[in-house]
Regions:
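Eukaryotic scaffold repeat domains enriched in small/polar residues
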Residues: 1-177
Length: 177
């Protein structure tokens, strides 16, 4: 009937009582609500990875053909957690056109900026090495599918990879533990 339902997936609350929410089919970022329950703003929006081939086709396609192309939407957030200092930690899927992990874990400050330290040998995005194709049956391919995150009191954080059933724990500098 054309009705769009608000479908919240995860929430976190800071020390002042502000509520942060991620919802299905919300691409503008994490929603922040005042203590009164009124909407305040979006923060921490994921970026769209540019697809050069798609840009090329849009220059030569007709308007009808362009309309049939998939929209370039940023990846949705999959989970959020709040640490004791009021920073939001968030996980997201990789962009559909991404060929590498692209900051699928973020530490978001009150300005909405990602301030995650990524000083480790690999970025804190789950599996650093993975197969993209395989002819063998039963081989899992693709980047980690991050669906969960939690933060400890000392700043370590653990992410959950649903694809391979793994947990990855990192320190506050982004080093895998």
């Amino acid at each position: 009937t054309g009705v769009t339902l608000f479908n919240p997936q995860k929430v976190a609350v800071d020390q002042t009582g502000r509520l942060y929410c991620i919802a299905q089919n919300v691409y503008e970022g994490i929603m922040e609500f005042h203590t009164s329950g009124s909407f305040n703003r979006f923060l921490g929006k994921n970026e769209v990875v540019a697809n050069p081939l798609k840009k090329f086709w849009t220059k030569i396609f007709s308007e009808t053909q362009i309309a049939s192309l998939n929209l370039d939407l940023p990846p949705e957030f999959t989970n959020i957690a709040m640490d004791e200092n009021g920073f939001l930690y968030a996980t997201s899927h990789p962009d559909a056109d991404a060929t590498t992990n692209a900051n699928m874990v973020k530490m978001i400050n009150t300005s909405g900026k990602d301030i995650m330290k990524r000083n480790g040998y690999v970025t804190p995005d789950g599996d650093a090495v993975y197969l993209t194709t395989s002819t063998e049956e039963g081989v899992i391919i693709g980047m980690s599918n991050l669906v969960g995150i939690t933060v400890s009191k000392n700043g370590n954080f653990t992410i959950v990879d649903e694809l391979r059933g793994r947990l990855f724990t990192y320190d506050n500098e982004g080093n895998i533990i």
